[in-house]
Amino acid sequence: MNTYPKLFSPIKIGETTVKNRVFMPPISTNLADKGYVTDALVEHYAARAKGGVGLIVTEVTTVEPTYVYLPGDMSICDDSYIPGWEKLTAAVHKYGAKILPQLFHRNLRRFPVYHLSMHSHYEPVGILGILLPLPH
């Protein structure tokens, strides 16, 4: 008897059909190089797709170059990142899985800031210049 009869059945999300209901949540690997997809990242996500995951949500993916949560984060802040993402997407699609980025942006909390091109530390920032107190 199958305890979870729908687990391996397709599911439609909007216009997209996912081959099963096995979803991989975002898990940081810090394998990107200054925001760019690396071969190690492609291998990592392709292995999960090959193993049967239906939908993969990538790790933190920054949307602006002046704010990175960790130096090994992925990015899509400009078109120079597209070739790596195309390679990653093709590798995951090869095994019938879908993939989407976990979009990451700064918020009202202060965090250390790393610039993608230098990985140097900047002062804490917040959206619109509004900063909430740091938690204790």
Task: Tell me what each language-model feature is.
Residues M1-H136:
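Flavin-dependent oxidoreductase catalytic cores
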